[in-house]
Amino acid sequence: MTSFLRSDRSRPVAIWLFIVAAMVFAMVVVGGATRLTDSGLSITEWQPIMGALPPMSEQAWRESFELYKQIPQFQLVNPDMTLEGYKEIFWWEWAHRLLGRTVGAVYAIPLIVFLIRRDIPRRLIWRCAAMLGLGGLQGLVGWWMVSSGLSERVSVAPERLMTHLGLALALFVLLIWTALDAWNGSPRVEERSPWRGWALAFLGAVFFQSLLGALVAGNDAGFVYNDWPLMNGRFFPGDYGGAGLWGTLAHSQAAVQFNHRIFAYALLLAAVVLVVLARRDRLLVGQGKSLATAVAAVVFLQAALGVWTLMAAVPISLGVLHQAGAAVLLAVATAFAWRVRRP
């Protein structure tokens, strides 16, 4: 078991970072619900300060609805939507943005206090500052994503959705890793673990699979090919190709779903190899073995949930649960990679 230097740790800082990570997890879940209910384009303006308040009068609601009526999603998809129907989708997007503002405040204000009190271990200060910058960037990316669906499209661009989710998950991983560092302090032992590279590679693979899932979501590809293990009776879909390489990889429903399936099978195989090798390795003890088992278990549960979600044609509840499962898998894979980075 690795021992740590107590002088280089801060439990209050760690607890704060874990809380922010939990809030980012909630953001990912609410974001999934916002997407699945087609609510993401209901607020057509970006007002970081004034936008924190919802419409406060019937006149304000009508004005907001009129703005929504000007975009293609209303004109081509929801021309019969009433004001009451608009309110339903508005609240999802508003809640998602409000939660984002709250996460920013819960991160920035304690950060300033901890810096003044010099409670943050010196080696983590720049990382904490970088995460503040990433949080601000995420807000800009969110609007960049929404803006792609306000003029020519009836939904946001899949690659922008992938960027938005990917940045959220990257911040989630970094928060967990930094919280673990703050909780435990610097390790006394600096020997390089043979598991470090493999664990980081697996974490990267899980992250990449999450990005592929975002492309599936952005293209509504979960609503086609709802059989398994084949795709409309074939292993390789006949309409895999799109308009060029990028059109295939980012915009073909058949391609993005096939890629997500194939990489899921690869992750399943990698998880089996991971847990078998971890169980046989005498140098990996205690938490390392337990976390390896947990990683494999969550991979299998997430894969089963993905198949269920697909075959059920993506009901909102299962779609949100599958997105939450991706974040849980990332969290467990992060904990495993962090724990085995040294003996």
UniProtKB/Swiss-Prot annotation:
Matching InterPro entries: COX15/CtaA_fam (IPR003780), HemeA_Synthase_type2 (IPR023754)
CC annotations in GO: plasma membrane
Chemical reaction(s) catalysed: Fe(II)-heme o + 2 A + H2O = Fe(II)-heme a + 2 AH2
Pfam family, one: COX15-CtaA
Amino-acid positions noted as binding heme in the UniProt annotation, renumbered to this chain: 260, 322
EC primary class: oxidoreductase
Pathway: Porphyrin-containing compound metabolism; heme A biosynthesis; heme A from heme O: step 1/1
Subcellular location: Cell membrane
Chief subcellular location: membrane
Residue ranges of the TM segments: 13-33, 96-116, 130-150, 161-181, 197-217, 258-278, 294-314, 318-338
Ribosomal protein is among the record's keywords: no
The keyword Cell membrane is annotated on this UniProt entry: yes
Gene Ontology biological process terms, A to Z: heme A biosynthetic process
Disulphide bonds in the chain: none
Cofactor(s) essential for the protein: heme b
EC number: 1.17.99.9
Protein family according to the UniProt entry: Belongs to the COX15/CtaA family. Type 2 subfamily.
Described purpose of this protein according to its UniProt entry: Catalyzes the conversion of heme O to heme A by two successive hydroxylations of the methyl group at C8. The first hydroxylation forms heme I, the second hydroxylation results in an unstable dihydroxymethyl group, which spontaneously dehydrates, resulting in the formyl group of heme A.
Protein name: Heme A synthase
Lineage: Bacteria, Pseudomonadati, Pseudomonadota, Alphaproteobacteria, Caulobacterales
Gene behind the chain: ctaA
